[in-house]
Structures are given as C-alpha cells and as structure tokens.
Amino acid sequence: MPDAVRRCPEDGFFEGDTCPVCDGAGTHILDGARRRQLSKFVSGALRHFPEDAGIEVDKAGWTGFDALRVAVERQYDWADAAALAGVIATDPKGRFERTGVGNEAGITTAGGRVRAAYGHSVDVTLDGTDDPVPATLYHGTAPRNVDSIREAGLKPMSRQTVHLSESAAAAREVGRRHAADPVVFVVDATAMQSDDRRIVKRGTETYTTDRVSPVYLSLLEK
C-alpha cells in the first residue's frame, strides 16, 4: 500500500508522515488506498481512455489540469483539486508531468497542464529528453514469454513503446504484474544506441524505445 499524501504549507505535497524538508506534519490530503485508486484512474485517463474520462489530450499528450480535476471529481465524490495535485506531485515513478505553473507544481492546486510521462496506447508524440541512458537496462516479464522474446525481441504490444527499467529489481517488480516468479532480460543499451536505436528516459526510472531486437537481449541468471 502506498504512503498517504500530505501537504506542507511551505514546501508542498509529500508522501509519508513528515515533510522531508522541514519535518512538519503538514495537512492530510489522501490515505494510501485512495491515492492508489486516484493514480490508477488518472493514469488510465491520460494514457488510454481520455474520451471516456471526459477530457481531451493534444498531440503531445497534454490536457488542462482543471479539466482533469473536473473528471476526477466526477469519478470520485471524495476527490478534489488538492488530491489530484498531490497524486501528480508525489508519484514515485514520475508517471505524470505538469507544466505551466512554474516552480509551483508541487504546491498549487489550479492551472497548468498535465500529461502521462509514458505508457500511452492513445496516439501521442512525446518530445525527447536529454537525460543520459545507462549502459544496461532491464525488462521483466512472465516465463511463458521467454521463447517468443528470444525469437522476435521486445515489441510495444498494446502500448506505443517498449518500457525498460533502470535496475533488475525494478524490472522484476514490473514482471510480477504478469507472473509470480518473473524472469528478467538484460538489454545492451550501449549497443542499441551505437546502432542508432533511440532510447528515452521517462519519469524517474523508466526508459522507452520503439522495440528491442533479440541481438541486444540476454536472460539474467537468477
């Protein structure tokens, strides 16, 4: 269960019991269960079903924060602007990006635009980033997929891009969504980039690419 979200009047939203900047208790915004519930809805609305959620996303995936607030308030009678802003600001994987509010993204509860940083099935084009890419990346999956991946590589499937993780532990956690005992593929990111295969960092620990050919993959030994 994720930590609760609280808000410090000086330093903005944070997760847990005390503000990491001033050690103050802040004001309770959301418990862990509702934080998870709201995060899943916002992720789905921005990535997969904006029209069903009652919002519009542009070609770069952006929608207005205030329009998204209306959508979440319609979905949950307990949700409000502070709950939405808190979920966006404290997401541990950086799933969401907010712009148009300067340095106040972690504090303000109105204005600006929001988008999902990665994971879209709707047709959007995300701009690149200048973040460096590690030499090695990882991908977690179910054991039943090993043979097909060795033969055809990693493909986006229902999403626009393949998602890779910065660490084997993070990849294994992703793999647990598909199997209790997942396997992890090692991705030679250096070789991919040397061959002009584009890899882009999204969020705090996720990297995306169009596909990964088998030549860049090896199975991580347990």
From Swiss-Prot:
EC code(s) of this entry: 2.7.1.-
KW Metal-binding (keyword) present: no
Keywords, comma-separated and alphabetical: NAD, Transferase
Molecular-function GO terms, alphabetical: NAD+ poly-ADP-ribosyltransferase activity; tRNA 2'-phosphotransferase activity
EC class name: transferase
Gene Ontology biological process terms in this record: tRNA splicing, via endonucleolytic cleavage and ligation
Top-level taxonomic group: Archaea
Any single Pfam family the record assigns to this protein: PTS_2-RNA
NAD recorded as keyword: yes
SUPFAM superfamilies: ADP-ribosylation
InterPro entries tied to this protein: Ptrans_KptA/Tpt1, RNA_2'-PTrans_C, RNA_2'-PTrans_KptA, RNA_2'-PTrans_N
Family: Belongs to the KptA/TPT1 family.
Described function: Removes the 2'-phosphate from RNA via an intermediate in which the phosphate is ADP-ribosylated by NAD followed by a presumed transesterification to release the RNA and generate ADP-ribose 1''-2''-cyclic phosphate (APPR>P). May function as an ADP-ribosylase.
Protein name (database record): Probable RNA 2'-phosphotransferase
Species the sequence originates in: Haloarcula marismortui (strain ATCC 43049 / DSM 3752 / JCM 8966 / VKM B-1809)
